[in-house]
Amino acid sequence: MKKDEYIKLHQSYLNEYIKFADAKALAIISINGFILNFNFSKRNIKFHNTEDIFNFTAFILLIITIILAAFAVYPRTNNRSEKGIIFWDNINSMGEKEFIEKVKFEKEEELLEKTIQQNYFLAKTASMKYSIIRKVFIISALGYSCLLFSSIFQIICS
C-alpha cells in the first residue's frame, strides 16, 4: 500500500469512528431524554421514602449523561492556527481566492504532511469522544439501576 493511500484510508477510518461516536452520543441523549420525560414529567419527588431517593439520584445521573453526551457531540477543529487549508474553521478565516491560491501552491509533500497532521487531530478527537461516551454509558447504567431499585421499592412498599 502506498503512503498516500494509507493516509486516506486512515483518515476515512477516523472520520467514520467519529461519526459513530456522535451517533452513540445522540442515541444516549434521545434515550435518556425519553426516560426522563416518561419517568419524571408527572412525578413529584418528596424524599419521604427510599423510592424517592433512588428516583432523584436517577434523575441527576441521567441529566449528567445528557450534558456529557452533548459535550461529546459538540463540534471542534482542534487546530488553533488562524489560517490553514485542512480544518473548516481555519479555511473559513480566509477568502475564497486566498484559499484556492494557498492550495494550488502547496507542494505535494506539504499537503501529505498536513493530512497526516489532520489524522493526528482526528485521532485525538475520537479518543476524547469515546472517553466521554464510556463515562456516559457507566453513569447511564447507574441511573438505570437507580430506576430499577426505585421500582423494586415501589413494588415492595405497595
Curated annotation (Swiss-Prot):
Q: Which GO terms describe its molecular function?
A: nucleotide binding
Q: In the UniProt record, which is one GO cellular component term?
A: plasma membrane
Q: Does the keyword Methyltransferase apply?
A: no
What kind of membrane protein is this, topologically?
Multi-pass membrane protein
Q: Which residues cross the membrane?
A: 20-40, 53-73, 136-156
Q: Which GO terms describe its biological process?
A: defense response to virus
The listed locations are: Cell membrane
Q: Which Pfam families match?
A: PycTM
**Keyword line:** Antiviral defense, Cell membrane, Membrane, Nucleotide-binding, Transmembrane, Transmembrane helix
Q: Does the keyword Translocase apply?
A: no
Superkingdom of the organism of origin: Bacteria
Known role: Pycsar (pyrimidine cyclase system for antiphage resistance) provides immunity against bacteriophage. The pyrimidine cyclase (PycC) synthesizes cyclic nucleotides in response to infection; these serve as specific second messenger signals. The signals activate the adjacent effector, leading to bacterial cell death and abortive phage infection. A clade E Pycsar system. The effector gene of a two-gene Pycsar system. Expression of this and adjacent SaPycC cytidylate cyclase (AC P0DV38) probably confers resistance to bacteriophage. The genes are probably only expressed in response to bacteriophage infection. Probably only responds to cCMP (produced by its cognate NTP cyclase), acts by impairing membrane integrity.
Under what name is this protein listed?
A: Pycsar effector protein SaPycTM
Query: What organism is recorded for this protein?
Result: Staphylococcus aureus
Taxonomic lineage of the native organism = Bacteria, Bacillati, Bacillota, Bacilli, Bacillales
